[in-house]
Amino acid sequence: MSTDVSSAENEGGAPIRTARVPKYYRLKKHLLDMTETLPPGTPVPPERTLAAEFDTSRTTVRQALQELVVEGRLERIQGKGTFVAKPKVSQALQLTSYTEDMRAQGLEPTSQLLDIGYITADDTLAGLLDITAGGRVLRIERLRLASGEPMAIETTHLSAKRFPALRRSLVKYTSLYTALAEVYDVRLAEAEETIETSLATPREAGLLGTDVGLPMLMLSRHSLDKDGRPVEWVRSVYRGDRYKFVARLKRPQD
């Protein structure tokens, strides 16, 4: 594979060799510039066409395209081709619901219930919910969508003892937070949220309509009420190619 080597000079005049630039990276940069000028849904030229245009192999073209798919700049649709992707959904890191976040972006939030039932708390989950190990926990797994597009898989855990009959209450109140407020007079006041990366499992990829192994954003949120009592522990997996999180930072007070 051919590469470019460039050099510069430091303050003493001695040359500084910079990193080699792989050929696929130059192609990737060209494609990236192209995506910034074309509307979402625009088809990308086929691999064969790009290989001929840039006098390179289809393997090199495939590598450039795959990196842009992983980064969320391009979208590959099975049997149709590769297209310019829609801009990522941007979410501020704050204590709001998924519904509030999506509506703030002008998107229509919907959910599909994947599973709901009771599990037995292990030591870790018991500590998070401030219950006895072996206690019952209501586990709710939902597929979160934005204007019909799958965005995340969200799994919520709540103490069955603290919130009796919550499963029945959710039939009346489709919003979990509304049910907690109206039925149990419990509202979230603060939370600790951790963001990590993971790779999409076959099940996650199938539900989210993406590729197995695609980078995901994995969020863990531990929410408390105004008295500092645990309310929920939530583990969410968001599509890394469609989602980004934004935080506003301030310097600590002296």
Swiss-Prot record:
UniProt cross-references to InterPro entries, sorted A to Z: Bact_HTH_transcr_reg, Chorismate_lyase_/UTRA_dom_sf, Tscrpt_reg_HTH_GntR, UTRA, WH-like_DNA-bd_sf, WH_DNA-bd_sf
DNA-binding region: 47-66
Superkingdom of source: Bacteria
Listed CDD domains: WHTH_GntR
GO MF, any single term: DNA-binding transcription factor activity
Record Pfam families: GntR, UTRA
SUPFAM superfamilies the record matches: Chorismate lyase-like, Winged helix' DNA-binding domain
Main subcellular location of this protein, as a coarse class: cytoplasm
GO cellular component, one term: cytoplasm
One BP annotation, GO: negative regulation of DNA-templated transcription
PROSITE patterns per UniProt: HTH_GNTR (PS50949)
Record keywords: Cytoplasm, DNA-binding, Repressor, Transcription, Transcription regulation
Compartment annotation: Cytoplasm
Role noted for this protein: Global regulator that is part of the nutrient-sensing system. In the absence of glucosamine 6-P (GlcN6P), represses the phosphotransferase system (PTS) specific for the uptake of N-acetylglucosamine (PTSNag), and genes involved in the metabolism of chitin, as well as several genes involved in development, thereby linking carbon availability to morphogenesis.
Protein name, per record: HTH-type transcriptional repressor DasR
